[in-house]
């Protein structure tokens, strides 16, 4: 029941919490909007399209593996970007978050929403985030939202955050999602968004 209810809550015909979460991520961006953005785990392209519309001088890349379990695809993302009039600035690539086919120090902003916990290519989540930071320019900004407090996936939360601070980053902030926005009780379940945390900072 919890999973079917959460699917309803995230759907456009429901209360659209996915859009609310994406709005929160966009609001947390502290950047002039001139440069390149990477969205890791772009899904349907919803977040990257919102970023493209918010920052009209940016150029954006969305990567996803688009596995069989998801109804999204690269073609659908491109179509969605075209509908919103941003397809000339947005590019989509099929790739794994564990091995980004991108150059070092290439992006001014890197974002990811509820992707890292899904990546099966590696169990080392620190290495996964290290790979995301690799493609970020020095001084560039990152905003990651995921189930970072789920210790079965990310290990002890305090130890996880301490290990992140040892990466090539100059600043790290962490916020519990439930303290940043109001969520219905069922979405606060640990299996849904109860373990969700936002990590933001600079390289």
Language model regions located:
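Conserved SAM-binding strand-loop segment of SAM-dependent methyltransferases
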Residues: 85-97
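A short acidic, Gly/Pro-enriched loop at the edge of an enzyme's catalytic core
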Residues: 98-110
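Core SAM-dependent methyltransferase catalytic element
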Residues: 181-203
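Class I SAM-dependent methyltransferase Rossmann-like catalytic core
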Residues: 2-24
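A short glycine-rich, Lys/Arg-flanked "PGG" loop and its adjoining helix->strand segment in the class I
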Residues: 126-138
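Conserved SAM-binding loop of SAM-dependent methyltransferases across substrates and taxa
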Residues: 44-56
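Conserved beta-strand signature within the Rossmann-like core of class I S-adenosyl-L-methionine
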Residues: 139-146
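Conserved class I S-adenosyl-L-methionine
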Residues: 33-43, 61
């Amino acid at each position: 029941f919890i999973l079917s209810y959460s699917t309803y809550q995230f759907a456009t015909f429901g209360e659209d919490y996915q859009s609310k979460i994406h709005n929160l991520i966009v609001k947390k961006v502290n950047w002039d909007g001139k440069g390149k953005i990477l969205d890791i785990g772009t899904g349907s392209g919803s977040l990257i399209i919102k970023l493209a519309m918010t920052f009209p001088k940016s150029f954006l890349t969305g990567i996803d593996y688009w596995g069989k379990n998801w109804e999204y695809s690269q073609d659908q993302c491109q179509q969605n970007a075209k509908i919103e009039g941003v397809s000339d600035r947005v590019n989509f690539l099929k790739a794994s978050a564990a091995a980004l086919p991108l150059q070092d120090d290439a992006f001014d902003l890197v974002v990811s929403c509820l992707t890292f916990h899904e990546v099966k290519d590696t169990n080392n989540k620190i290495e996964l985030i290290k790979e995301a930071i690799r493609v970020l320019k020095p001084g560039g900004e990152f905003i990651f939202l995921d189930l970072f407090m789920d210790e079965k996936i990310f290990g002890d939360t305090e130890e996880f955050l301490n290990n992140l601070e040892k990466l090539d980053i100059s600043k790290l902030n962490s916020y519990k999602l439930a303290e940043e926005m109001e969520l219905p009780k069922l979405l606060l379940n640990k299996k849904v968004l109860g373990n969700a945390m936002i990590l933001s900072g600079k390289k």
